[in-house]
């Protein structure tokens, strides 16, 4: 999937909200619905609603979106593997962004997002040996995006060269228990470039390349050692991973993968 440096469209909120500043129309709205993995299951769905309003080059553009993901029916089991209830997990997010042109060819955007995840659908039953109860989790996150788009005149029409950059889901962690286990949200960095070549008034060809980097630290293996060279237990690994702050995790993700050579 790519979209951080492609042409602006109504779905730019997901890929790069800074692209909305280059939309030609005053505003717009779009709705998408995708049945997920229909050849395997029939009750997993993804819904997405997005829109924007351009207040002018000086005032900027506001945009927002709502996404909802239903995971269908899931059989819950306790720590012994015994099934006790069926749940319908779901996750949703709502966000609001503001973008503005910094230059004729450059725009920037900032987005704020509220994320909510309910993996056990409100079933607060003991699922571990220590009788830890699961609860819905939520957190806040932000995106910072840039977009550069410059026309290049050719005999057959204007071509467009574009660069896109988006740091997304920069925010806190989520806990499904009473806070003992902190889970990272999928922070991500996108960087892309595209070139659109016109053939005539009705036909154009775009070339685009995009790189993605997940900004989530790697969970160490069960053979990890502490500073004294002693093997860490499973509980110690869990506590160590939960203790990593979000900003530290973003930076650590660049060098903590297995096989990395410093």
Where are these regions (language model features)?
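Subset of outer-membrane beta-barrel
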Residues: 1-262
């Amino acid at each position: 999937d790519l979209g951080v440096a492609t042409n602006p469209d109504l779905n730019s909120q997901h890929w790069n909200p800074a692209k909305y500043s280059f939309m030609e129309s005053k505003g717009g709205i779009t709705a998408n619905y995708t049945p997920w993995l229909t050849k395997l299951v029939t009750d997993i769905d993804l819904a997405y609603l997005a829109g924007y309003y351009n207040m002018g080059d000086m005032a900027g553009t506001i945009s927002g979106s709502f996404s909802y993901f239903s995971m269908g029916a899931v059989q819950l089991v306790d720590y012994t593997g015994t099934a006790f209830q069926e749940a319908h997990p779901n996750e949703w997010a709502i966000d609001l962004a503001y973008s503005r042109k910094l230059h004729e060819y450059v725009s920037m955007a900032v987005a704020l997002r509220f994320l909510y995840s309910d993996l056990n659908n409100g079933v607060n039953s003991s699922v571990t040996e220590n009788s830890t109860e699961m609860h819905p989790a939520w957190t806040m996150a932000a995106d910072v995006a840039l977009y550069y788009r410059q026309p290049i005149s050719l005999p057959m029409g204007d071509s467009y060269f574009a660069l896109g950059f988006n740091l997304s889901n920069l925010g806190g962690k989520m806990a499904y228990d009473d806070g003992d286990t902190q889970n990272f949200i999928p922070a991500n960095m996108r960087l892309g470039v595209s070139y659109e070549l016109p053939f005539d008034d009705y036909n154009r060809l775009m070339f685009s390349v995009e790189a993605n980097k997940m900004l989530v630290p790697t969970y160490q293996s069960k053979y990890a050692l502490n500073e004294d060279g002693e093997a860490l237990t499973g509980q110690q690994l869990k506590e160590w991973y939960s203790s990593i702050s979000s900003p530290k995790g973003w930076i650590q993700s660049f060098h903590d993968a297995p096989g990395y050579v410093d």
